[in-house]
């Protein structure tokens, strides 16, 4: 096998190991995944949620339509979708199977529960300016 073929096969193998299917834009989906995972760990639906994320994620998600939510947009919608309809076992396809009745539940959750979004400040990230 030629060196170029070995390199090619190595790259293909890395891609097979590292790439995972995702439903829509990965940043809101990542928030849905985290929210779904948190709900699973808590063992109940939380009545309030604090989301501390980097300014870049805030900027990239605040106006994005969250898949399978009938046009809901933004961080809060992504989090609520994960809490109400997410399946954390599906990782980045966490909200691929949202049912119509769950969309109403997501909207109700957004209306009646508190989701606070704050810029995350760490030594690595620094102060976010949003």
Ranges and model annotations:
Residues 1-12, 45-59:
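Acidic-glycine-rich active-site phosphate/pyrophosphate-binding loop
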Residues 115-117, 125-126:
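C-terminal binding/interaction regions
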Residues 10-23:
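Generic N-terminal amphipathic, Lys/Arg-enriched alpha-helix
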Residues 21-24, 65, 69, 93-96:
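Hydrophobic alpha-helical scaffolding
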Residues 2, 6-10, 26-33, 70-74, ...:
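Conserved active-site and cofactor/substrate-binding residues in soluble primary-metabolism enzymes
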Residues 28-44:
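Alpha-helical support elements that line or immediately flank enzyme active sites
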């Amino acid at each position: 096998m030629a060196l170029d073929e070995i390199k090619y096969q190595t790259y293909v193998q890395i891609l097979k190991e590292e790439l995972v299917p995702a439903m829509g834009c990965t940043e809101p989906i990542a928030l849905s995944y985290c929210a779904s995972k948190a709900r699973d760990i808590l063992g109940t639906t939380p009545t309030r949620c604090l989301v501390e994320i980097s300014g870049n994620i805030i900027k990239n998600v605040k106006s994005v339509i969250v898949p399978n939510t009938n046009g809901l947009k933004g961080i809060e919608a992504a989090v609520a979708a994960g809490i109400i309809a997410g399946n954390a076992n599906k990782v980045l396809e966490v909200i691929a199977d949202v049912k119509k009745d769950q969309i109403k539940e997501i909207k109700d959750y957004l209306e009646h529960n508190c989701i606070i979004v704050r810029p995350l400040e760490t030594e690595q990230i620094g102060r976010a300016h949003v």
